[in-house]
């Protein structure tokens, strides 16, 4: 019987494809945009619920307004971030 530890093991060539810089940057920006949307909308909902309970006699509209403000803020930050990334990519090319 042959001992499998004595035979040299050939290293497999790396087949992992590296993504282009622009695609990796875009993926990073989209991840940040989606996480911002989730966080800011949730914070807006939380503030809306608190104001609804404390000030507005448990009405629903402050919660919806809070979600809208959070989502709007996240959208603007995402838009700015993506435009800045596009400018940087164009400057490099």
Swiss-Prot record:
**Per UniProt, which keywords does this protein have?**
Membrane, Mitochondrion, Mitochondrion inner membrane, Transmembrane, Transmembrane helix
InterPro entries of this UniProt entry? Mic10
According to its record, how does it sit in the membrane?
Answer: Single-pass membrane protein
Can the keyword GTP-binding be found in this entry's annotation? no
Which protein is depicted?
MICOS complex subunit mic10
From the broadest rank down, the organism's phylogenetic lineage runs: Eukaryota, Fungi, Dikarya, Ascomycota, Pezizomycotina
Chain's role: Component of the MICOS complex, a large protein complex of the mitochondrial inner membrane that plays crucial roles in the maintenance of crista junctions, inner membrane architecture, and formation of contact sites to the outer membrane.
UniProt GO cellular component terms: MICOS complex; mitochondrial crista junction; mitochondrion
Q: Describe its assembly.
A: Component of the mitochondrial contact site and cristae organizing system (MICOS) complex.
* Gene Ontology terms: biological process: cristae formation
- Extract the PANTHER family matched here: MICOS COMPLEX SUBUNIT MIC10
């Amino acid at each position: 019987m042959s001992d499998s530890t004595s035979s040299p093991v050939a290293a497999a060539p790396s087949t992992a494809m590296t993504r282009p810089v622009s695609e990796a940057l875009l993926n990073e920006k989209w991840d940040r945009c989606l996480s911002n949307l989730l966080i800011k909308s949730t914070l807006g909902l939380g503030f809306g619920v608190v104001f609804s309970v404390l000030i507005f006699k448990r009405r629903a509209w402050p919660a919806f307004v809070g979600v809208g403000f959070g989502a709007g803020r996240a959208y603007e930050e995402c838009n700015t971030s993506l435009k800045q990334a596009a400018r940087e990519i164009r400057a490099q090319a």
